[in-house]
Amino acid sequence: MKYDEFYKLCEKVYEPITNFEKSCLPLCAAENEQSEFTKIPLKSFIQDKYIMGGIEEYQEHNNFIGSNNLFELYNLLNRLSSELFKSMYADGRTLTGVNTISLLLMSLFKNNDKILISDEECGGHSSMPKLCKRLGIKTCSMPYDYNNYDFDYEKLNTLLLDDSIKGILICQSDMIFQPKLEKIKMDKNKILIYD
């Protein structure tokens, strides 16, 4: 395929995305409308846009609004990479958010490892238990003190004495206060991921 054809296809795919951008303000669930982070999508065209599933076949069910436009762009990138580099697969998604956590979990833990996570009931990101399950990582909820809107560090530190616990994933989506990481006591063989 000639590269000017790719350029025309890119323009065709790009137009619905920019139209979508003009009519929507995509907010991250963990941010309020005044934060600088939520203004990034207004300044950039593709940064921090999400699409669930792979990029070879679009999964419409429960996917993000506007992700069908993004899928077309990733599909075009995949085709161009195949043409230029003879690659079988190219993933142009940015290494941010859930993509980063996925990579960290796959790199730092093994199948059947057990970790503590901040679950949905205490403001944790709702996709983390599902992601861990898909990667074969067992999860337990971090103890939470609902009266103080914070983790129960005494109970947490007791749990961390268990050698079968390989680490902690604190991935908050909705939170009132920053967790006090300095109160977590863990040995050097355990891993803490904080997003």
Describe the role of every protein-language-model region.
Residues 89-94, 117-118, 169-170, 192-195:
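General beta-strand structural signal in soluble alpha/beta enzymes
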Residues 177-195:
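Catalytic PLP-binding core of fold-type I/II PLP enzymes
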Residues 109-124:
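Conserved PLP-anchoring active-site segment centered on the Schiff-base-forming lysine
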Residues 1-61:
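N-terminal "arm"/small-domain region of PLP-dependent enzymes with the aminotransferase-like
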Residues 38-41, 100-108:
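Buried hydrophobic packing segments
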Residues 131-178:
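PLP-dependent aminotransferase-class I/II
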Residues 46, 50-100, 107:
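Conserved N-terminal alpha-helix of the aminotransferase class I/II PLP-enzyme fold
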Residues 98-103, 123-128, 176-180:
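Short glycine/serine/threonine-rich phosphate/pyrophosphate-binding segments
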